[in-house]
């Protein structure tokens, strides 16, 4: 595997939206224990995936609580191929701040970096405050995939990371495979629209 086979992916978003839980659920689903997640203990984890018969190493970076202190710097974004912008579906403020995170990607990220909007904690249906159709509309305007996940139950977690990997593959390697995502917990899959 050479450097071109490594995709650097960042998890960003407000504190306590579940970024570390998503990372741990994806990279080690058999040993995931929600109570064991320590928000300041993870820098990055690796996971190998296959796209079109080719193996890629996803190097997934977590902010490890730095976002609470607004200490995320341009060095964190350096070399990133993709960014999962996460919010908590039960916390409207975390969704409202997504635009600020998108601005930060624009300010510090590589031109053309792939992005996926992720609404986490979709298992908390009775506490949900952010309507998926609003988030989908915003993602459509940006021309990026949107997906709701639950790190607790594992719903759509792998799909979110694979949508990110597919976006990177298409944008940076030249693959033609469109991202197919199941945006909302329990909804049928859909192909990402191309927005002009």
Curated annotation (Swiss-Prot):
Organism listed in the record: Dictyostelium discoideum
Domain of life where this protein originates: Eukaryota
Entry keyword set: Cell membrane, GTP-binding, Lipoprotein, Membrane, Nucleotide-binding, Prenylation
Listed SUPFAM superfamilies: P-loop containing nucleoside triphosphate hydrolases
Intracellular or extracellular location(s): Cell membrane
Protein name (database record): Ras-related protein RabG1
Lipid group attachment sites (S-geranylgeranyl cysteine): 196
Protein family membership: Belongs to the small GTPase superfamily. Rab family.
Residues given in the record as GTP binding sites: 13-20, 62-66, 120-123
NCBIfam families reported in the protein's UniProt record: small_GTP
The keyword Ribosomal protein belongs to this UniProt entry's keyword annotation: no
Lineage per the UniProt record: Eukaryota, Amoebozoa, Evosea, Eumycetozoa, Dictyostelia
């Amino acid at each position: 595997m050479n450097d071109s086979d490594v995709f650097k992916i960042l998890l960003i978003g407000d504190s306590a939206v579940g970024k570390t839980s998503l990372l741990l659920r994806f990279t080690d689903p058999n040993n995931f224990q929600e109570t064991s997640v320590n928000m300041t203990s993870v820098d990055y984890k690796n996971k190998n995936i296959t796209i079109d018969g080719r193996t890629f190493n996803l190097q997934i970076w977590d902010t490890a609580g730095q976002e609470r202190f607004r200490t995320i710097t341009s060095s964190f974004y350096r070399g990133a191929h993709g960014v999962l912008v996460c919010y908590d579906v039960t916390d409207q403020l975390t969704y409202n701040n997504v635009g600020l995170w998108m601005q930060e990607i624009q300010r510090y990220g590589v031109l053309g970096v792939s992005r996926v909007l992720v609404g986490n904690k979709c298992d908390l249906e009775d506490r949900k405050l952010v309507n998926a159709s609003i988030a989908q509309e915003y993602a459509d305007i940006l021309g990026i995939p949107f997906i709701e996940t639950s790190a607790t139950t594992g719903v759509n977690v792998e799909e979110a990371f694979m949508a990110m990997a597919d976006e990177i593959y298409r944008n940076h390697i030249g693959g033609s495979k469109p991202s197919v995502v199941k945006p909302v917990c329990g909804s049928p899959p859909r192909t990402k629209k191309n927005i002009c």
